[in-house]
Amino acid sequence: MKAPPFAYRRVDSVAAAAALLREHGDEARLIAGGQTLLATLGMRLSEPSLLIDIRGIAEMQGIAVADGHLRIGALARHVDVERSALVARHLPLLSLAAPHIAHAAIRNRGTFGGSIAFADPAAEWPACTVAADGALTLSDGTRSRTVAAADFFLGLYQTALRPDELITAVQFPLPGPQRRFAFTELARRHGDYATVGLALAGDVTDGRLDDPRIVYFGVGGTPVRARAAEAALAAGRAEPAALDRAVAELGGELAPAGDLYAAAATKLHLAGVLLRRGIQSLMAEDAQS
């Protein structure tokens, strides 16, 4: 594989990157970790005339807690999130999901914001961001705006990002002491894209589940929040009958497409299997705390 010819510019500010995006339009691509872009260049699936290297933008770096939120800079690598003590303490859902992202070599280079911006429907971070009520800070270098993760993913590889905007950070509200998380996915091999995956959150107190978030990935063009299944489980003890009702609701909420490895009916069945596993993990975490 050989990439097509391209010009290269390295920038150190969001404003500079946005200005180049406005100047060059569809002919420009941002590059940070490059774990998706480099592959598409090599296969000639993408032939931009300009690559804009944004790795040196300081305001897009780092992981911090302030003002009741966990802030993850868009340029934080997957491995940074995986190893972060702040993430493990305040938002363990991300710590649970990180080891499932591809392989170590990719996690060492790929970026948190890059994965979210690419919006692969089988990727882990988009679903986790929705399940944890994340909000994205988008900037064109002059103005910034905040978009809830639930409103950011519009369709297959489509997002609310404007052509001259960058994701600079993702903010997560710090969860309360009763918030519990679970993450599970099924893949043919570790590191492969998930056939079906689930990010799960809920308040658990004395065996009672409140305010659940059930977000699937790999079953649609975007992360899919299973609201009817949530309603079947909310304000209950997640007993077998309630869990059966929640699994039954998935048939009306998920419309997975079959592929070479699993038929649509198989994926729907697996979604129910993951929900049972995830709820069991969620409730077990409360029993151990």
Predicted regions and their residues:
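C-terminal structural segment of proteins
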Residues: 1-289
